[in-house]
Amino acid sequence: MIKDKIKNLDLSATLKINELSKNLEKDGKEVIKFGFGQSPFHVPDTIVDELKKNAFQKSYLPIQGLDKLRESIASYESKKKNKKFNSEQIIIGPGSKELMFLLHMSFSGEIIIPTPSWVSYKPQSLIADNKYHWINTTADNNWYPTAESLEELVSKDKDKSFLLILNSPNNPSGQICKNFKELSEVIKKYNIIVLSDEIYSDLTFDEKNESIFNHSPSNTIVSSGLSKWCGAGG
């Protein structure tokens, strides 16, 4: 009764490692965890207080999310990216992972995934029946695809639609993309859609974190959330 593509999916590697480490801790073992992106810091008091204040809310929400919240996010992103956003450009969901999955389900085309990358991009493509392509990265280019490798891939079939996933700062390398300008030229040339996963964008300390959006805004969908920078996963 369950589709083969679901039955044949592996458990998320990060969640699997986390469960294994929990069992080892139950057995009295000391475990140093490198495989799970759970913040060790407390959720900021302001976030906790606002959640408490609104715990009584039970009405069905607007489809795109609370108007006031969308307006606040639009204002924040406008300052961050030096580009005017309005609330109509913002969609709220139960988590960025779920919103990414909806994008996979909605997109009619092929997915380009840098390797190495976050473990859930590929399974989401499989469930959505989207063909995916791995694009190799190296330490020489900060673990991001080069413009040349991207063009080589998409130029083989110019009539197809492609969705490129870019995650900066990157999971698992922690590196920041340095070649947005070069990538954007290929993105605009072939009209590639970009999913810019910016879940770690507020966790950069040495420099301002740039976005591919600043170079190719018309082609870019930005994804972010609360789970990393304020430790509010779930």
Where are these regions (language model features)?
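Helix C-cap/helix->beta junction micro-motif
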Residues: 24-27, 128, 189-190
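Hydrophobic/aromatic ligand-binding patch that stacks against planar heteroaromatic rings
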Residues: 124-125, 186, 212
